[in-house]
Amino acid sequence: MPAPYKKGSEKKGATLFKTRCLQCHTVEAGGPHKVGPNLHGVFGRHSGKASGYSYTDANIKKNVLWDEQTMSDYLENPKKYIPGTKMAFGGLKKEKDRNDIVTYMLKACK
């Protein structure tokens, strides 16, 4: 079972997001979808629901409600958490890295 989410470093999370996520995702309101969906407003939304993005059936059917814990769990191993996801990212194995990136995302994706 994945480790419980704990608030991390927003600054370190921003760096991680830039190097690990930004090539496929945007976070700003009204930002475009890229290879992956725009993540603005992701927290409190169900998986597979970003308007205008074409998700796999797996993401839609999983119907995860994204919060700090579910996002952290997903980022540990996306393909294990949602088998059939398009997300090619292998995951963040270090608990600290997941905490940092989720802490950053909580602010950046509002």
Swiss-Prot record:
Positions of disulphide bridges: none
GO molecular function: electron transfer activity; heme binding; metal ion binding
Description of post-translational modifications: Binds 1 heme c group covalently per subunit.
Compartments, record wording: Mitochondrion intermembrane space
Protein's UniProt keywords contain RNA-binding: no
GO cellular component: mitochondrial intermembrane space
InterPro entries: Cyt_c-like_dom, Cyt_c-like_dom_sf, Cyt_c_1A/1B
Keywords, sorted A to Z: Electron transport, Heme, Iron, Metal-binding, Mitochondrion, Respiratory chain, Transport
PROSITE patterns assigned to the protein according to its UniProt record, in alphabetical order: CYTC
Pfam families on file: Cytochrom_C (PF00034)
Amino acids binding heme c: 21, 24-25, 87
Protein role: Electron carrier protein. The oxidized form of the cytochrome c heme group can accept an electron from the heme group of the cytochrome c1 subunit of cytochrome reductase. Cytochrome c then transfers this electron to the cytochrome oxidase complex, the final protein carrier in the mitochondrial electron-transport chain.
Family: Belongs to the cytochrome c family.
Identification of the protein by name: Cytochrome c
Lineage: Eukaryota, Fungi, Dikarya, Ascomycota, Saccharomycotina
